[in-house]
Amino acid sequence: MNNKKILILGAAESGVGAAVLAQKQGFEVFVSDNGKIKDNYRKMLIEKKIPFEEGTHEGAAKLIAPLNPPLRGDLAQSSNVALPQSPPEGDLGGLEIIKSPVIPDNVPLLVNAREKGIPIISEIEFAGRYTDAKKICITGSNGKTTTAMLTYHILKNAGLNVSLAGNVGKSFALQVAEENFEYYVLEISSFQLDGMYDFRADVAIITNITPDHLDRYDNNFQNYVNSKFRILQNQTKDDYFIFWSGDEVICKEIEKREVKANLLPFDLEETDDTFAFTKGDQLIFKQIVLSAITGKSEKQQITKSTNNQINNNQQTNQPYMTMELENIAIKGVHNLYNSMAAGLAAQVVNIQSDKIRRALETFDGVEHRMEYVASVRGVRYINDSKATNVNSTWYALESMQTTVVLILGGEDKGNDYAEIADLVRKKVRTLIFLGKDNEKLKKFFANFENKEQGTKNKDSLSATNNKIKIIETKSMQEAVDAAYEVAKHGDTVLLSPCCASFDLFKDYEDRGRQFKECVIKL
């Protein structure tokens, strides 16, 4: 039995997975969840004989601040189920906390632990200690789920022994405990990165960085940026960093930091530095001279020159792969960026070009991300519930070729709606606010006027200069019913909320499912 004790805060996918892995590694484990544990996770804890509590953090607090006499009776009394085995004793020696990413760092329990010098880490950090698999890690403000799932799709269809984990798919820790994969594609949020210290990404991807979750970062954008760049913190000269070179925030951060990994930028336009770009109607990937990650061939040195510009030594101009843009399965400029990032990651792990091309042509997309639901009375309904920040909604609106009825709102995260103001004026007929508190939205969008230029539907806004209609709703059914009433033939009803979902829904998935259910019933 390992002498270290593991306290896990949060008994959902990541927490229970971490508990199973910790138990397998011989640690004493105790799981604490302040809410109600879902039946499937409770069943797993009981079957594995892992002690836990729910509806309280009382037991967890006692482990952090040990009391006498021993805690078993107190813990069992505070739990909603009998403990299958004794919880860890209240000795701080060797205690480590693995916390759910949804728990803020400033809750008193964690503040107390930090003051006592108790390490607090994420499930990703913990699981990374116990696998030698190659890890392709994706973060960013937008596009990380699509990029992760597309990368997984390419690798899986190429025959690699690969799994999907992190912020999507099954728990990384549970898979490390029970499976033996050679590759992991990990979507990693900023909250997960905040609890990562020694974890090393063999391939790191940052899709983009725009303001998001600022309420968790003291409303300081640089704090959020620093969190995203933690994905690079332990990379070496044998690793790779894939990024969009059109993102000014990312490029400025690269100039400020010592990035040891090979740099693989991509953009719409070709430069001397880009490894993926478009030319006419073609998507083009340049050849990468592979490094130690695949053990195949001589490493390509890609470094920064003294003037902080990206400098590619030994770069070949020979194309690795080309394909017609119209054959890429997922549409829109944002998905073109996602395809470039995933394609470069696949090339790094030595996937043949024809397999990358075929996978890009067959990927079905991600549920709740620009997902087509149905057409009713000549109106298309699109579910973009995963758009929980302004930049995501910007990309959604930018891709629209018709007049839009836009459903937005929810739990504001310090949003600056000015980023979508021009697109709203050009493309939106009606704004439908969906949330408990719509005051910030109403104040910003009051008196907006249509200035549409060139939509394809026959009832174009360009003939008028009308004030954009605003409708307030408090449920998804109300929002969909309102959209049905105001949308005209040829319009698109777009659910792209800009905001978190927790004011009215369990999560963005619940919000998206309710939208689809309401649309199907029209």
List each language-model region with its residue ranges.
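N-terminal leader/targeting and accessory segments in enzymes
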Residues: 1-68, 74-84, 91-122, 126, ...
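Nucleotide phosphate-binding/pyrophosphate-handling subdomain across enzymes
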Residues: 2-5, 15-25, 300-303, 323-429
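Phosphate-binding loop of NTP-binding sites
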Residues: 4, 23, 84, 101-261, ...
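Short internal beta-strands
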Residues: 28-35, 241-245, 407-408, 427-436
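C-terminal helical cap/extension that packs against the catalytic core
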Residues: 38-46, 421-490
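Beta-strand->loop->alpha-helix junctions that form or flank phosphate-binding loops
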Residues: 53-57, 121-125, 260-278, 359-361, ...
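Extended acidic/charged loop-beta regions that coordinate divalent cations
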Residues: 56-59, 178-216, 252-308, 312-325, ...
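Intrinsic disorder/low-complexity segments
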Residues: 60-95, 287-322, 447-468
